[in-house]
Amino acid sequence: MLKIGDKQFESRLFTGTGKFANSRLMAEAIQVSGSQLATMALKRVDVNDQQDDILLPLVQAGVNLLPNTSGAKNAKDAVFAAQLAREALGTNWLKLEIHPDPKYLMPDPIETLSAAEQLVREGFIVLPYCHADPVLCKRLEEVGCAAVMPLGAPIGSNKGIVSHDFLEIIIDQANVPVVVDAGIGSPSHAARAMEMGADAVLVNTAIAASNDPVAMAKAFKLAVESGRMAYEAGLACKVSHAVASSPLTSFLDEL
């Protein structure tokens, strides 16, 4: 069981709501994935419409909502968006995203830390999207973030765990859950993150942009479960030389 803030999750696969062909497909894929937490940009939902085609199916399925501040270019924008989200959706959970560069969508570490400090003081449960920077992740933890969400690779790139070495350090030193977010392009990438000891992964593009999002969601569900199981079982140590699994040298010497 994964605990973040005041909630517990059986599923360690978190999902996004963007890039799906339609809301029906989004809802079906998220349901099949088993995900209990889905993020959405406030700008994509009509919070005044109880029948909003993104919000309604998630609420009906009992999926926890994680509004994000996508589109914010600085801390001021992010704090304002967070306050709107809390008022509109009735949740103090927030995925903090600040990426001023629209081409590469790299998170701004300085503005992210500044916004995180203020939002924590205002009572938000903050999950910041950030670079795979061990120092930054530790600082975000120290200011009170409920989890950290370092990137595996740039958003939507599907390149996988390119920040592997830094993620290992972050996971090793963290006292809050580590959710690998962005760049995960295949179920094997998700399994790898879980095998490293990540507490969860967040996947959107790899599911939504696949030829069969529902089947891909199921594949990610199984990958996350198997990766976590492998981590808990304890992976065999890597060695630089061969070690025979069934040595028969003494037997052969007797022939």
Curated annotation (Swiss-Prot):
<feature type="active site" description="Schiff-base intermediate with DXP">
    <location>
        <position position="95"/>
    </location>
</feature>
<dbReference type="InterPro" id="IPR008867">
    <property type="entry name" value="ThiG"/>
</dbReference>
<feature type="binding site">
    <location>
        <position position="156"/>
    </location>
    <ligand>
        <name>1-deoxy-D-xylulose 5-phosphate</name>
    </ligand>
</feature>
<dbReference type="InterPro" id="IPR033983">
    <property type="entry name" value="Thiazole_synthase_ThiG"/>
</dbReference>
<keyword id="KW-0808">Transferase</keyword>
<keyword id="KW-0704">Schiff base</keyword>
<dbReference type="GO" id="GO:0009229">
    <property type="term" value="P:thiamine diphosphate biosynthetic process"/>
</dbReference>
<comment type="similarity">
    <text>Belongs to the ThiG family.</text>
</comment>
<comment type="function">
    <text>Catalyzes the rearrangement of 1-deoxy-D-xylulose 5-phosphate (DXP) to produce the thiazole phosphate moiety of thiamine. Sulfur is provided by the thiocarboxylate moiety of the carrier protein ThiS. In vitro, sulfur can be provided by H(2)S.</text>
</comment>
<dbReference type="Pfam" id="PF05690">
    <property type="entry name" value="ThiG"/>
</dbReference>
<feature type="binding site">
    <location>
        <begin position="182"/>
        <end position="183"/>
    </location>
    <ligand>
        <name>1-deoxy-D-xylulose 5-phosphate</name>
    </ligand>
</feature>
<comment type="pathway">
    <text>Cofactor biosynthesis; thiamine diphosphate biosynthesis.</text>
</comment>
<dbReference type="GO" id="GO:1990107">
    <property type="term" value="F:thiazole synthase activity"/>
</dbReference>
<dbReference type="InterPro" id="IPR013785">
    <property type="entry name" value="Aldolase_TIM"/>
</dbReference>
<keyword id="KW-0784">Thiamine biosynthesis</keyword>
<comment type="subunit">
    <text>Homotetramer. Forms heterodimers with either ThiH or ThiS.</text>
</comment>
<keyword id="KW-0963">Cytoplasm</keyword>
<feature type="binding site">
    <location>
        <begin position="204"/>
        <end position="205"/>
    </location>
    <ligand>
        <name>1-deoxy-D-xylulose 5-phosphate</name>
    </ligand>
</feature>
<dbReference type="GO" id="GO:0005737">
    <property type="term" value="C:cytoplasm"/>
</dbReference>
<protein>
    <recommendedName>
        <fullName>Thiazole synthase</fullName>
        <ecNumber>2.8.1.10</ecNumber>
    </recommendedName>
</protein>
